[in-house]
Amino acid sequence: MVNSHGIRYIRLKQVFNRALDQSISKLQSWDKVSSCFPQYVNSKQGAINVANCQRQLTEFWTELCQREFKEIMEERNVEQKLNELDELILEAKERYTDRDQDEVNKGPAIDELSSKELVECHLYSQRMHAIHEIDERLAKVNEMNDQLAQELKDLETQVEVEKNEIGKMYDEYLGSHTDQPANVLLVQSLNDMVLELKENY
């Protein structure tokens, strides 16, 4: 894990501070500021007033830029993303150095890899790990599907057996071979049951 302030975030702040210093240096140049008020600064009080305005403007501009920079960093979560990038690159370097020495000798030296290549090494490893997890989950899903298919097949067999048994009962007790007069209500009920089974299955 990297420190709370990663190297890339520190460098970004250094770049910002240099840009801010260059911008402020123009405001801090008395020659440039006084040239905007050539007659006014000729008097002592006028020069004092312009100097005070210059100081206040410099402080205001510095505070404004720093506040906006901080808000942008927080809004876009830049520090965390840069720290995560540091971690990815560090992890990629560690993974690369831990590889078999023979494979390392065949490839380029770690110092010769760019940040992009190191990140790609890490992403490749992450993708392979994700593919392995997906394969395992897919195997479990296929196993569940096979179990469900077998249960469905068993259920269909059971339903077919019950249909045959009902058909035999119908033929035995209510078919043309019986000598006893059939109960009309019972016959109708069984007929409805058989029709319902045939429609549903």
Swiss-Prot record:
One Pfam family here: Nnf1
Q: What's in the keyword line of the UniProt record?
A: Cell cycle, Cell division, Centromere, Chromosome, Kinetochore, Mitosis, Nucleus
Instruction: List the InterPro entries.
Output: Nnf1, PMF1/Nnf1
Gene Ontology, cellular component aspect: kinetochore; MIS12/MIND type complex; nucleus; outer kinetochore; spindle pole
Domain of life of the organism encoding this protein: Eukaryota
Cell division is among the record's keywords: yes
One GO term (biological process): attachment of spindle microtubules to kinetochore
Q: What is its main location?
A: nucleus
**Disulphide bridges in this chain?**
none
Subcellular localization: Nucleus; Chromosome, Centromere, Kinetochore
The keyword Cytoplasm is annotated on this UniProt entry: no
Q: How does it assemble?
A: Component of the MIND kinetochore complex, which is composed of at least MTW1, NNF1, NSL1 and DSN1.
Task: Recite the other comments.
Answer: Present with 2070 molecules/cell in log phase SD medium.
List, alphabetically, the PANTHER family matched: POLYAMINE-MODULATED FACTOR 1
Chain's role: Acts as an essential component of the kinetochore MIND complex, which is required for the spindle checkpoint and kinetochore integrity. MIND plays a role in establishing a bipolar spindle-kinetochore interaction by joining kinetochore subunits contacting DNA to those contacting microtubules. NNF1 is required for a number of nuclear functions. Cells depleted of NNF11 or containing a temperature-sensitive NNF1 mutation have elongated microtubules and become bi- and multinucleate. They also have a fragmented nucleolus and accumulate poly(A)+ RNA inside the nucleus.
Q: What is this protein called?
A: Kinetochore-associated protein NNF1
